[in-house]
């Protein structure tokens, strides 16, 4: 089993589109089995990119939640004094208190201070995770975290574990990471055999990609890069290539900016469906990345499609 994580330093770089195209290309291979793990649990959209059909749904629980039993509460106010997050308010009738879930940090101070035992602790559901079939071939595992909830890194681990259960020894798991370099990204990159860094050819894209490179290096992961939205600025294209050369990240390919790519996605297809010269550029890039993955599975130190050692 080979795990490939696709990441970018910022949102909107084209990470999910490239990850979806790669997963479809791998699934189309003879004997190819691919699992797409959408680990952007705060805003998963892999199901849209791959036209997913849900076949399994499971709740995700993370830590305790707290509530106040109105009949047991005497409104003594001790819980309000103990709460440092202003999460406890008077009820609509003013005869008891209630906990505002969106403000509660689940520290348990209210539970410890209530003399009447009116505060109760329960296991709180903060999201769901899913398994789905797709119209393009790869199975999809993804999750949805409730707005304002934490533990996104743990939910990423749940998604990856479920993907691993579906995979076989010869499978490739394509992990679509969240943007940035935060906790869910670290959880997405952990244990990956290869990281594909999607670099948007813009000032913010290059700067944020450099931060991601530093993270990948600190985690001792092998990495290659794909440049996206090239052709808009020769200066930005050159700066992106220079950054990759200075950091020693092999460049697998470049995909120029083209509004037609958006139209392809809106029609329900991946970027592999576009024709013409743009289609050749996309296909060449995806094939180069796929070549690196196959070389790793064969225990080869480098990929002929890139001509550089990882």
Where are the model-predicted features located?
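Walker A/P-loop phosphate-binding motif and the immediately C-terminal alpha-helix
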Residues: 3-36
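Hydrophobic alpha-helical segments and helix pairs
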Residues: 103-142
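N-terminal glycine-rich dinucleotide-binding loop that anchors FAD/FMN and/or NAD(P) in oxidoreductases
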Residues: 51-70
């Amino acid at each position: 089993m080979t795990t490939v994580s696709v990441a970018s330093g910022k949102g909107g770089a084209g990470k999910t589109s490239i990850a979806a195209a790669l997963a479809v290309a791998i699934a189309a291979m003879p004997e190819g089995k691919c699992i797409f793990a959408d680990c952007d649990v705060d805003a998963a959209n892999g199901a849209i990119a791959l036209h997913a059909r849900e076949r399994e749904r499971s709740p995700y629980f993370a830590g305790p939640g707290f509530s106040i039993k109105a009949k047991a509460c005497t409104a003594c106010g001790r819980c309000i004094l103990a709460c440092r997050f202003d999460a406890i308010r008077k009820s609509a009738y003013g005869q008891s208190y209630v906990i505002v879930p969106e403000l509660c940090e689940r520290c348990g101070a209210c539970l410890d201070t209530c003399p009447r035992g009116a505060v109760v602790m329960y296991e709180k559901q903060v999201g769901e995770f899913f398994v789905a079939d797709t119209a393009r071939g790869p199975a999809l595992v993804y999750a949805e975290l409730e707005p304002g909830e934490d533990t996104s890194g743990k939910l990423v681990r749940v998604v990856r574990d479920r993907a691993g259960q579906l995979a076989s020894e010869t499978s490739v798991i394509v992990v679509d990471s969240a943007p940035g370099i935060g906790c869910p990204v670290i959880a997405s990159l952990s244990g990956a055999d290869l990281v594909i860094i999607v670099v948007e050819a813009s000032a913010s894209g290059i700067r944020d990609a450099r931060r991601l490179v530093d993270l990948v290096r600190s985690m001792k992961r092998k990495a290659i890069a794909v440049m996206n939205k090239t052709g808009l600025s020769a200066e930005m294209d050159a700066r992106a290539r220079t950054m990759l050369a200075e950091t020693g990240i092999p460049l697998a390919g470049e995909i120029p900016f083209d509004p037609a790519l958006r139209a392809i996605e809106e029609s329900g297809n991946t970027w592999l469906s576009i024709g013409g010269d743009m289609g050749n550029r996309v296909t060449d890039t995806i094939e180069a990345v796929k070549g690196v993955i196959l070389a790793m599975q064969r225990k080869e130190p480098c990929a002929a499609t890139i001509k550089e050692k990882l």
